[in-house]
Amino acid sequence: MDVKFKFHFTRYILLGILLFFIINGVVENIIISRKINNFMRQAVLVDEDVENGIKFYCVSRETSKPSINKIDGKYYIGATGDILLKKASPYPEIPIFHQLTTYFVGGHAAYVVDSKTTIEINGKDKDNNTVSYYGNAWFSLKECIGVRLKNQSIVSDVTENIKSKIGTKYNYTFLFNNGYYCTDLMSASVYEVSHKDNINDFSVTTANDIIDSKNVEISYYHYTDNKEIKHVYYVN
């Protein structure tokens, strides 16, 4: 009897956790969709790069930091302190898992150091799995979301904090504090500077958590339509 009770109790607990995870994922995606749509609704078409199939839409905002820059003929997303996020999971080669991860978790994240440079960590390549500087190539993605900390006064300290983590190994366990995974690197770098500006929900940090956070606002979004036209929404 005790064994049977324990079995059923454990099963209900696991089902409860699964149900919570599903509901939380659905709610997060609804909120994210609303945030993106609200951001896009504020935009006005201001330019078009016909040759490269790009349309630019500006969201007017009081800021000295535009969220896209053109340097030497190339486009770079983000200003110092912005976080770039990819909704798609990094595992397109694994059907079903890729779709589920994309919906419930999201994909990769990067911290913008300057227009041309990001700080990231990638666990797919075990020979190159440390916090490192990267060239900012995020404009080449089919879809990208950029968020900006609402409290801009901490950006300088957060930037120095994340720079201090260069060389730290990837955390494959997601549980122990022996390294970082990409989105965890973003949230930890903010939280260690200012607890009140935390950008996750005090659990395992996902891309969805960061986009959904009340302490960030969307500053950039682009997607590529089925005609391969890239629609770019940015603040200026």
Task: Name what the model sees in each region.
Residues V105-H108, D157, N161, Y181-A188:
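Extracytoplasmic/secreted proteins, especially bacterial periplasmic and envelope-associated proteins
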Residues I54-N69:
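Short, structured beta-strand/loop micro-motifs enriched in basic residues and often containing a Trp
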Residues D72-R148, N171-N177:
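Glycine-rich catalytic cores of cysteine/serine-nucleophile enzymes that process amide/ester linkages
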Residues H8-L18:
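Sec-dependent N-terminal signal peptides
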Residues K87, I121, E160-K169, A188-K196, ...:
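Structured segments of extracytoplasmic/periplasmic soluble domains
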Residues D2, F20, N24-E51, K55, ...:
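Activation targets extended, charge/polar-rich intrinsically disordered C-terminal tails
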Residues R148-I166:
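A structural motif
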Residues M1-H8:
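N-terminal Lys/Arg-rich, disordered targeting/topogenic segments
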